[in-house]
Amino acid sequence: MTDALHVATLNIRNIADRYEERLPLILADMRALQPDVMGLQEVVYPMQEDRLIGASGEARYRAIRAWAGRPEYGNSVLVREPLEAMAEDRIDLDRNRSAIRVLIRLPGGATVLFAATHLHHVPADESVRDEQAGRLIDWLDAAPAADAQVLVGDFNAEPDEPACVRLRAAGFRSAYAEANGADPPVTWPSGIQAPGMDTDGDPGCLDYIWLRGKVRATDARLAFDRPAVGDPTLYPSDHLGIEAHLLVGE
């Protein structure tokens, strides 16, 4: 038996880059998207950003957090009711980075281990990201058994960088590439213009939904990718998101 699963990921860029102006764009896109499970990066917990995003539409979500570098900031996984997350775990990846994983049983009986992360950002430090990817793989190899693993996030790595090569060698496939034939050319920067915006690095594909095990992508596309009406310099975040429709158990 197979289960359908709709997943998404977005680096929400904390509270920087015209946050008060772009927050309504995040909420509007989330209201339309309503995935089953979503990974968020750069969440500021005291601002309740993850819970606010989860409450933007008709669906209700549980937010599961994993701090990175300091206790008020990090990654979050939103799990849509009535799905339940079990076996929650966090790993520290050093350089103020971490990952979170949860085990989810789907209505048809299939199980998914869903993980979210945000790797080191300095463009030249490919070896750091490669080491972080290796630790992620070891951690996921030791995770509770599941039919499939879904690993999402901002990897700060192009598809040909060692971290991504290592993930593919470990059996992970990019959902976007599986559905479309190749990864998107760019997921950062989005096109936002803001004081103090991050300009370190060339535009490229840095964000992914990785799949391993009995799962395949039937559709994948960019999300949170539309500028504000009347302002082409304002986007939901400095990153574009990705969403994917999956079949788990085959």
Task: Describe each region flagged by the PLM.
Residues 6-12, 26-49, 78, 102, ...:
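Active-site beta-strand/loop signature of hydrolases that rely on acidic residues for catalysis
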Residues 7-23, 70, 120-128:
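Acidic/histidine-rich helix-loop elements
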Residues 16-17, 46-49, 71-75, 122-124, ...:
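Short catalytic/ligand-binding loop motif for oxyanion handling, primarily in non-cytosolic enzymes
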Residues 19, 37-119, 219-224:
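Structured beta-strand-rich core segments of catalytic domains in phosphoester-bond hydrolases
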Residues 20-24, 50, 96, 161, ...:
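Structural motif corresponding to alpha-helix initiation and N-cap regions
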Residues 50-53, 128, 162-165:
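Short amphipathic alpha-helical segments
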Residues 125-141:
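Alpha-helical scaffold elements lining the catalytic groove of polysaccharide deacetylases
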Residues 141-149, 157-250:
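Metal-dependent phosphoester-hydrolase catalytic domains
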